[in-house]
């Protein structure tokens, strides 16, 4: 109580020290509202568009009630608007059953995906030993082929040196031209040998088939 009295006295003292021509602050009175609803002129181009729709009518009815002249039934949404609102609500605010079903479908899809991935991994692991064997065999074949090419090229170079003489530089154009000619003949010879082996294999297969079915070979031709 004593503290409030001292505070009041200090405020009075401050007011007494003000200049004679000064006065205390006085707020303006709040603007007076019109006693009734205000309806904008639809012909006025400066009228905001939202004031010409049902939203503004709803505000006037909420403020003035029946004095606004708004029919309450006109504020309800139309059947089409209700359907749109219901569709929007179902999309953004689904029911608990819908959310549970969506979660169940998602979990089933994830489980199916996991099982397929595990099955794929198991199949790959089962194929891994054979894949390693095939890879090792391929590496061995590549190495053997590289060694054979290296030996063949060394043999052709030695043959070219015997034909041209050992004093000829292997980097010379004459030596390289002869080496290319020898390689061409070598490839032709290998191709002919391969074709010959294929013909011999076909002939052997035909002879084996005839030997297994002698009746067919001895049948008279019409």
From Swiss-Prot:
Q: Does the keyword Endoplasmic reticulum apply?
A: no
Q: Where is the composition biased (Low complexity)?
A: 203-212
**Short name of any one Pfam family annotated for the protein:** CR6_interact
Residue stretches in coiled coil: 99-212
Q: Which GO terms describe its cellular component?
A: mitochondrial inner membrane; mitochondrial large ribosomal subunit; mitochondrial matrix; mitochondrion; nucleoplasm
* Compartments where located: Mitochondrion; Nucleus
Map out region (Disordered) in residue numbers: 19-46, 188-222
Which UniProt keywords are listed? Cell cycle, Coiled coil, Host-virus interaction, Mitochondrion, Nucleus, Ribonucleoprotein, Ribosomal protein
Q: Where is this motif: Nuclear localization signal?
A: 184-200
Tell me the Gene Ontology biological-process terms attached to this UniProt entry.
mitochondrial translation
Q: State the source organism's domain of life.
A: Eukaryota
The record's misc note reads: Cells overexpressing GADD45GIP1 were more likely to be in G1 and less likely to be in S phase and grow more slowly than control cells. Inhibiting the expression of GADD45GIP1 promotes cell cycle progression.
This molecule's function is given as: Acts as a negative regulator of G1 to S cell cycle phase progression by inhibiting cyclin-dependent kinases. Inhibitory effects are additive with GADD45 proteins but also occur in the absence of GADD45 proteins. Acts as a repressor of the orphan nuclear receptor NR4A1 by inhibiting AB domain-mediated transcriptional activity. May be involved in the hormone-mediated regulation of NR4A1 transcriptional activity. May play a role in mitochondrial protein synthesis.
What name appears for this protein in its UniProt entry? Large ribosomal subunit protein mL64
Which gene is transcribed and translated to give this protein? GADD45GIP1
